């Protein structure tokens, strides 16, 4: 009782002092409207209490409590004697116990219900609040309480009838109704707030409010702005009810209301906003504050509070734990995935290395396989013939045999010469075996009669010098001979027939080509014949007669060299014509053989040779080459 008396003293002193600064500092224009409504309600409540005092016949004890309540309303303005305060403390002690019950959301007990029945007759305002909460709990004790309250006043019964249908409406709509309602009876506002909560602790809150005087209901409506101070909780339980009606309007956050309803299963949102508003969202703190308050009231209420609060806490904790576990699982999955990826990468990298190693081995094998093919020159040049170039013009067969004596036995030496018997400067040397020919090839570049001998395999086709000689070693392949000296007066077809018939004795003739002049269409005096066999025999026909002229047969060279050779030799018969001719192309064909100064006077007027000072040889060669090029294009 000593603790409760202290609470009663603080309840009387603090309301007026705490409400003013909080209103100034925290309330908006919307709060000022609420204060005007509460002031009107105070006056109306006082009038209703005075009317009901005359009408009701209640025991003196109850009247004294109601008179004390009316006096407590006046104490906020004019402080009365300590004797009245003591009487209030006795009635307010019950308020403290009931308010403790409110903080610790506990299920209703029959004893506080009976107290509420006796206290409901004290004032209409408190009774109406009791009637509002009673329909929420569907228990017989609540029904008995409703009966006693209905006998107290007709307004209470009407309010009870209203609570049942309103119970099933949404909480947000009920809050709006509480804000907008400025009726004479607080029952209408209380009736609407109760269904919004739908919890058992609201009934005990109403009990505590009914046991308190009108002072609690009227004066507490003003200090509602102190929503975030635990001191207001200790002052009055009725103050919590009125202040709770206004605090939800200020918050206007459905999320916080839902959280408060879940965390405080047995306590109302109004109590949580006024009692534990500093931590409305903190569910654990609200429950802890509720437990010590429940211990002051009764141990049974504390147990009920713990059961209900514990029943609703695990979902939130489970949700958090589940979220944490899900995060951990996701992180673990990611880490496992990364590890798997790394392993897979490592596995992928190693096979690549193995593959590369295998490829290297294969490459080595391939290179080894290619190595035996390097001496293919010997196999390809299995012919025993070498081409010897840059030979001295005074060389003889004996000189060549002595030169290659160290390499091996020389079987044959074929030196190329012109028609007049002059040596061309190259020849072919045949050895007894390919090995001897390869050994002789190593002597390439050595001096022979003052000249560096150029040696190469006859069948090798790398350079223009060895391409022609190499054809001698090709037995089955077709080879070409160059024929000149036949009469050019014959037609092209006639010349081809005579040549084919003449050389068919040696072997099979595959092709006969007779170059002609583009302008006249006449033969140019030479031809090319391809033979698959009898090449050597065809060469022996050199000097024979065809078409009234002696022919010269030799091995064919590349067409460029043939052209040069034909241009050099053609003037032998046509020199008189070209020498005195006015046509520049013909005069230029044989200009190489003529002295350099012979055609200088003729070329001087053109200015072609005056600047160079080299004579007419070079320009005449260019002109002749142009003519021959056009002719060979026709061949192809």
UniProtKB/Swiss-Prot annotation:
Enumerate the SUPFAM superfamilies for this protein: RNA-binding domain, RBD (SSF54928)
Which InterPro entries does this chain map to?
NUCL_RRM1, NUCL_RRM2, Nucleotide-bd_a/b_plait_sf, RBD_domain_sf, RRM_dom
Q: Quaternary state and partners of this protein?
A: Interacts with THAL in the nucleus.
Keywords attached to this Swiss-Prot or TrEMBL record, sorted alphabetically, are: Nucleus, Repeat, RNA-binding, rRNA processing
Q: What else is known?
A: Disruption of NUCL1 induces NUCL2 expression.
Tissue-level expression reads: Expressed at low levels in flower buds.
Give compartment(s). Answer: Nucleus, Nucleolus
> Has the keyword Transcription been applied to this entry?
no
- Bias-annotated ranges (Basic and acidic residues): 43-63, 76-89, 104-118, 224-238, 342-367, 552-566, 579-604
Biased-composition ranges, Acidic residues, are 90-103, 122-133, 152-163, 182-193, 267-278, 299-311, 331-341
> Per the record, GO CC terms?
nucleolus
Q: Which gene encodes it?
A: NUCL2
- The answer on whether this UniProt entry bears the keyword Oxidoreductase reads no
Domain called RRM: residue spans: 384-460, 479-558
Taxonomic source organism? Arabidopsis thaliana
Residue spans with biased composition (Polar residues)?
A: 368-383, 464-481, 622-636
Q: Name one GO biological process term.
A: rRNA processing
Query: What does this gene product do?
Result: Involved in pre-rRNA processing and ribosome assembly.
Which region ranges are annotated with the description Disordered? 1-386, 458-481, 544-636
GO terms assigned for molecular function = nucleosome binding; RNA binding
Indicate what this protein is called per its UniProt record. Answer: Nucleolin 2
């Amino acid at each position: 009782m000593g603790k409760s008396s202290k609470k009663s003293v603080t309840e009387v002193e603090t309301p007026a002092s705490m409400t003013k600064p909080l209103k100034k500092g925290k309330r908006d224009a919307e709060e000022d409207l609420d204060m005007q409504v509460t002031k009107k309600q105070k006056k109306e409540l006082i009038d209703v209490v005075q009317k009901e005092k005359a009408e009701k016949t209640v025991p003196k004890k109850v009247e004294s409590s109601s008179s004390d309540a009316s006096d407590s309303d006046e104490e906020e303005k004019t402080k009365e004697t300590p004797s009245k305060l003591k009487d209030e403390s006795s009635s307010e002690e019950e308020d403290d116990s009931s308010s403790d019950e409110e903080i610790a959301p506990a299920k209703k007990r029959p004893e506080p219900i009976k107290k509420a029945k006796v206290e409901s007759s004290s004032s209409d305002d408190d009774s109406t609040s009791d009637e509002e909460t009673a329909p929420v709990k569907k228990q017989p004790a609540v029904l008995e309480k409703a009966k006693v309250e209905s006998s107290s006043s007709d307004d209470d019964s009407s309010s009870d009838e209203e609570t049942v249908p309103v119970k099933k409406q949404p909480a947000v709509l009920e809050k709006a109704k509480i804000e907008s309602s400025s009726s004479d009876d607080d029952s209408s506002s209380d009736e609407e707030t109760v269904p919004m909560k739908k919890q058992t602790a609201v009934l005990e809150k109403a009990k505590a409010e009914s046991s308190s005087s009108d002072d609690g209901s009227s004066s507490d409506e003003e200090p509602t702005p102190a929503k975030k101070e635990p001191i207001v909780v200790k002052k009055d339980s009725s103050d919590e009810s009125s202040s709770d009606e206004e605090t939800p309007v200020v918050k206007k956050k459905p999320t916080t209301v839902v959280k408060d309803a879940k965390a405080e299963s047995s306590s109302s949102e109004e109590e949580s906003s006024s009692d534990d508003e500093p931590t409305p969202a903190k569910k654990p703190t609200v429950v802890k504050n509720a437990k010590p308050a429940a211990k002051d009231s009764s141990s049974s209420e504390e147990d009920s509070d713990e059961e209900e609060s514990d029943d609703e806490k695990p979902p939130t904790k489970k949700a958090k734990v589940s979220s944490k576990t899900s995060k951990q699982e996701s992180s673990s999955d990611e880490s496992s995935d990364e590890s798997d990826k790394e392993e897979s990468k490592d596995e992928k990298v190693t096979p690549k290395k193995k593959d590369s190693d295998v490829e290297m081995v294969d490459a080595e094998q391939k290179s080894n396989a290619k190595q035996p093919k390097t001496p293919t020159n010997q196999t390809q040049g299995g012919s025993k013939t070498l081409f010897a170039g840059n030979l001295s013009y005074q060389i003889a067969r004996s000189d060549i045999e002595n030169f290659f004596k160290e390499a091996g036995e020389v079987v044959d030496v074929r030196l190329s010469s012109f028609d007049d018997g002059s040596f061309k400067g190259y020849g072919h040397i045949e050895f007894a075996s390919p090995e001897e020919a390869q050994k002789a090839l190593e002597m390439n570049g050595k001096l022979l009669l003052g000249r560096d001998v150029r040696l190469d395999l006859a069948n090798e086709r790398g350079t223009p010098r060895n391409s022609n000689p190499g054809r001698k070693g090709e037995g089955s392949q077709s080879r070409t001979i160059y024929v000149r000296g036949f009469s050019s007066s014959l037609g092209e077809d006639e010349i081809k027939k005579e040549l084919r018939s003449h050389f068919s004795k040696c072997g099979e003739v595959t092709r006969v080509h007779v170059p002609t002049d583009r302008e006249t269409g006449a033969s140019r005096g030479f031809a090319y014949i391809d033979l698959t066999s009898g090449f050597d025999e065809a060469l022996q026909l050199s000097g024979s007669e065809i078409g009234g002229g002696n022919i010269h047969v030799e091995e064919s060279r590349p067409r460029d060299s043939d052209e040069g050779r034909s241009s050099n030799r053609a003037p032998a018969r046509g020199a008189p014509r070209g020498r005195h001719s006015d046509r520049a192309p013909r005069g230029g064909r044989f200009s190489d053989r003529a002295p350099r100064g012979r055609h200088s006077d003729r070329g001087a007027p053109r200015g072609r040779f005056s600047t160079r000072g080299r004579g007419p040889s070079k320009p005449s060669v260019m002109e002749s080459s142009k003519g021959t090029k056009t002719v060979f294009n026709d061949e192809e």
